[in-house]
């Protein structure tokens, strides 16, 4: 078996990587051990920056129908460490800042896009060995037909917290041991009103409950007194009922429970997200206590950061430095999530001192000048990428908000759907930069338009992931393009179906 890229792990993050790569015309194979999508309740929250980034690549349900209508900024209520009052706001023209979708639904959506773009999805296939070679990676695979070898140019490990890819490649991690015990499951309560929906804090721990459309209750418990001694022991319905009743301080009768799992605050951050021709994304790269709905969003942003870079490298339009930037950009973002989830967990522990801190934080959340920073941290809207060019301008690395072009139907979200780097030239002042970019014309999407009221620059280079790659005031445009894409002279593009149903590029 041969491919240009193998993605090991077919959860939502792995499937999104595959959809991105295949959309660029990269021969991609997904190797997934599970034979079908798991319906076990997992993550359901995507935060603003992940939602905005998916919109720019055409992945939102309805192909972007959730985008703002121009009526102004939109806001959604959230929490910090179970303290309500946090408001997350998205700019005008962007999707709603919080998207609720079951993880299984997203996995199916991304798999459908990956298959439609030409990716091979092989379920029931387990990777048993990995060897990096000078010009590629060799994988030993066990599948329904027996053992097989797979040779690829690059490897992406999206195989979760117990990543085989990470372990086989010997990538070290910074870890913190578990200090709390938690359970999750779908319970059938004998009295559906016995548990109030939402967050319940008692001196004995936490219960978070939410009723499902089918009448079951998704229950999570948190005990801050210590970690489970037998992490591998499968929890039972009786154990879940006992823990819920203990924390609630009264008997909570259950007629049954299923999909019961243990989890904790065990933390892992891989010391590098890249080694040679292999990359880590999602839980394979970073793991934290699941508070604040940030895990899935972080993995989505990993995938959208890596996809276009790896596709360009496969096609010879980018070099090692661009591939290295994946680790330089995403590892600090993952560390920030690990740190803020640890801070939130500290605020969830019992005790009078913590009670006082929670009261203080509740007051801060009521003040916009303090709450805005927390909201931007949780939603990743405050993130700015590290400088990439030699002399960065003040706009480089910032995520460019959506806007509509003058006298035209297109907006930024629409222009980025085909996955090409976008060069925006505003008015006559912007047009003077076109000649400087001519050597990269086959790679770029160049859009000449009128001046945008309030725009800070006459030209902008926007990366496929929505971040500003260059603006006047720093390095010259040619230097920025050379840093990202080499010295130009790329072969002409051939249009292919993009993940969002628009047009993508194949560099061949």
Locations of the language-model features?
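Core beta-strand elements of the Rossmann-like FAD/NAD(P) dinucleotide-binding domain
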Residues: 3, 145-154
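FAD/FMN-dependent oxidoreductases across multiple families
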Residues: 233-295, 340, 383
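Active-site-adjacent segment of FAD-dependent monooxygenases/related oxidoreductases
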Residues: 39-113, 212
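Conserved FAD-binding catalytic core of PHBH/FMO-like flavoproteins
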Residues: 112, 154, 158-265
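Helical substrate-recognition/capping region of FAD-dependent monooxygenase/halogenase enzymes
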Residues: 2-4, 8, 23-24, 77-87, ...
């Amino acid at each position: 078996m041969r491919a240009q890229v193998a993605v090991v792990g077919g959860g939502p993050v792995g499937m999104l990587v595959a959809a991105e790569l295949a959309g660029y015309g990269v021969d991609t194979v997904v190797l997934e051990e599970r034979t079908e999508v798991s319906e076990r309740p997992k993550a359901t929250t995507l935060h603003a920056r992940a939602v905005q980034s998916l919109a720019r690549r055409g992945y939102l349900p309805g192909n972007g129908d959730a985008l703002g209508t121009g009526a102004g900024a939109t806001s959604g209520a959230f929490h910090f460490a179970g303290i309500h009052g946090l408001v997350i706001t998205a700019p005008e023209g962007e999707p709603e800042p919080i998207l609720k979708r079951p993880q299984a639904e997203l996995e199916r959506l991304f798999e459908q896009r990956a298959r439609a773009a030409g990716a091979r999805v092989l379920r029931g296939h387990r990777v048993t060995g990995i060897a990096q070679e000078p010009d590629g990676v060799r994988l030993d695979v066990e599948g329904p037909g027996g053992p097989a070898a797979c040779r690829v140019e690059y490897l992406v490990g999206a195989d979760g917290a117990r990543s085989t890819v990470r372990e086989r490649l010997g990538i070290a991690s910074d870890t913190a041991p578990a200090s709390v015990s938690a359970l999750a499951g779908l319970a059938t309560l004998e009295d559906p009103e016995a548990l109030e929906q939402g967050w319940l804090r008692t001196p004995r721990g936490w219960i978070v409950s939410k009723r499902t459309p089918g009448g079951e209750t998704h229950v999570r418990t948190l005990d801050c007194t210590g970690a489970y001694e037998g992490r591998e022991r499968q929890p039972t319905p009786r154990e879940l009922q006992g823990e819920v009743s203990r924390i609630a301080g009264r008997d909570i009768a259950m007629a049954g429970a299923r999909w019961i799992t243990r989890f904790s605050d065990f933390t892992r951050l891989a010391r590098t997200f890249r080694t040679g021709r292999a990359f880590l994304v999602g839980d394979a790269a970073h793991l934290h206590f699941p508070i604040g709905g940030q895990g899935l969003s972080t993995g989505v942003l990993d995938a959208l950061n890596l996809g276009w870079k790896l596709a360009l490298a496969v096609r010879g339009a980018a070099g090692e430095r661009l591939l290295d930037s994946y680790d330089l950009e995403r590892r600090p973002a993952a560390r920030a999530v690990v740190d803020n989830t640890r801070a939130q967990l500290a605020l969830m522990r019992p005790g009078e001192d913590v009670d006082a801190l929670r009261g203080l934080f509740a007051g801060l959340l009521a003040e916009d000048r303090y709450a805005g920073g927390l909201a931007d941290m949780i939603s990743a809207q405050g993130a700015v990428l590290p400088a990439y060019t030699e002399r960065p301008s003040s706009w480089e690395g910032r995520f460019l908000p959506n806007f509509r072009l003058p006298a035209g139907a297109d907006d930024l979200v629409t222009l980025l759907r085909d996955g090409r780097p976008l060069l925006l030239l505003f008015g006559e002042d912007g047009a003077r930069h076109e000649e400087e970019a001519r050597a990269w014309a086959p790679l770029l999407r160049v859009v000449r338009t009128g001046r945008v009221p309030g725009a800070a620059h006459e030209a902008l280079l926007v990366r496929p992931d929505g971040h500003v790659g260059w603006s006047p005031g720093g390095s010259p445009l040619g230097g920025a393009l050379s840093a990202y894409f080499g010295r130009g002279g790329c072969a002409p593009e051939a249009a292919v179906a993009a993940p969002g149903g628009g047009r993508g590029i194949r560099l061949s």
